[in-house]
Amino acid sequence: MDRPVIVALDLDNEEQLNKILSKLGDPHDVFVKVGMELFYNAGIDVIKKLTQQGYKIFLDLKMHDIPNTVYNGAKALAKLGITFTTVHALGGSQMIKSAKDGLIAGTPAGHSVPKLLAVTELTSISDDVLRNEQNCRLPMAEQVLSLAKMAKHSGADGVICSPLEVKKLHENIGDDFLYVTPGIRPAGNAKDDQSRVATPKMAKEWGSSAIVVGRPITLASDPKAAYEAIKKEFN
């Protein structure tokens, strides 16, 4: 089975959203990521519309709060028919457990429980920021591994991490875990605000379960062609 290429819809209004989606083809063949920018501007109705149209949705809100609040937030999100959602691993094991419990409690009967992905270190975080601003003395790869192990032990279904860390995670955690990787840039594309990036081919070779790609698709002159090319390279 093909591993998904998830289109990051980092847009701020439904007009932009509809314009991009109209160029990507059959909704049943498209997996999209809705993050804070679109969700906070367009609201919960945009998720309902997308699911009704047949899109698979990764709702990326990166919950990070006390366990009870995250439980109730996850419980509400589970009612929306989404496929993936996220928490920050730095919120700790009890918060992750509460998020998973909330997703289970909120999922309607007969529906699949959304997969819970824990964000390790954002792909915009460099080694210098990790060391000098987060005051973490571990190398980036070791920090990500530590957070990923804790997330799996706490009930997460996978992690969000840079493709640069995936091979090490496979070796130390195993293959029964999702490794979803943003920071994907086809050869020749600008890094933009990402620090730890890789091409779709590299992500494939290192073992990413799914990749998240935004601007190289949404800003392309032909978004569908760009999407199909990236899917071909990744699979």
Curated annotation (Swiss-Prot):
<dbReference type="Pfam" id="PF00215">
    <property type="entry name" value="OMPdecase"/>
</dbReference>
<feature type="binding site">
    <location>
        <position position="123"/>
    </location>
    <ligand>
        <name>substrate</name>
    </ligand>
</feature>
<keyword id="KW-0210">Decarboxylase</keyword>
<keyword id="KW-0456">Lyase</keyword>
<dbReference type="GO" id="GO:0004590">
    <property type="term" value="F:orotidine-5'-phosphate decarboxylase activity"/>
</dbReference>
<feature type="binding site">
    <location>
        <position position="215"/>
    </location>
    <ligand>
        <name>substrate</name>
    </ligand>
</feature>
<feature type="active site" description="Proton donor">
    <location>
        <position position="62"/>
    </location>
</feature>
<dbReference type="InterPro" id="IPR001754">
    <property type="entry name" value="OMPdeCOase_dom"/>
</dbReference>
<dbReference type="GO" id="GO:0005829">
    <property type="term" value="C:cytosol"/>
</dbReference>
<feature type="binding site">
    <location>
        <position position="33"/>
    </location>
    <ligand>
        <name>substrate</name>
    </ligand>
</feature>
<feature type="binding site">
    <location>
        <position position="214"/>
    </location>
    <ligand>
        <name>substrate</name>
    </ligand>
</feature>
<feature type="binding site">
    <location>
        <position position="10"/>
    </location>
    <ligand>
        <name>substrate</name>
    </ligand>
</feature>
<dbReference type="InterPro" id="IPR014732">
    <property type="entry name" value="OMPdecase"/>
</dbReference>
<dbReference type="InterPro" id="IPR018089">
    <property type="entry name" value="OMPdecase_AS"/>
</dbReference>
<comment type="pathway">
    <text>Pyrimidine metabolism; UMP biosynthesis via de novo pathway; UMP from orotate: step 2/2.</text>
</comment>
<dbReference type="InterPro" id="IPR013785">
    <property type="entry name" value="Aldolase_TIM"/>
</dbReference>
<feature type="binding site">
    <location>
        <begin position="60"/>
        <end position="69"/>
    </location>
    <ligand>
        <name>substrate</name>
    </ligand>
</feature>
<dbReference type="InterPro" id="IPR011060">
    <property type="entry name" value="RibuloseP-bd_barrel"/>
</dbReference>
<keyword id="KW-0665">Pyrimidine biosynthesis</keyword>
<comment type="function">
    <text>Catalyzes the decarboxylation of orotidine 5'-monophosphate (OMP) to uridine 5'-monophosphate (UMP).</text>
</comment>
<feature type="binding site">
    <location>
        <position position="194"/>
    </location>
    <ligand>
        <name>substrate</name>
    </ligand>
</feature>
<dbReference type="GO" id="GO:0006207">
    <property type="term" value="P:'de novo' pyrimidine nucleobase biosynthetic process"/>
</dbReference>
<comment type="similarity">
    <text>Belongs to the OMP decarboxylase family. Type 1 subfamily.</text>
</comment>
<protein>
    <recommendedName>
        <fullName>Orotidine 5'-phosphate decarboxylase</fullName>
        <ecNumber>4.1.1.23</ecNumber>
    </recommendedName>
</protein>
<dbReference type="InterPro" id="IPR047596">
    <property type="entry name" value="OMPdecase_bac"/>
</dbReference>
<feature type="binding site">
    <location>
        <position position="185"/>
    </location>
    <ligand>
        <name>substrate</name>
    </ligand>
</feature>
<comment type="subunit">
    <text>Homodimer.</text>
</comment>
<dbReference type="GO" id="GO:0044205">
    <property type="term" value="P:'de novo' UMP biosynthetic process"/>
</dbReference>
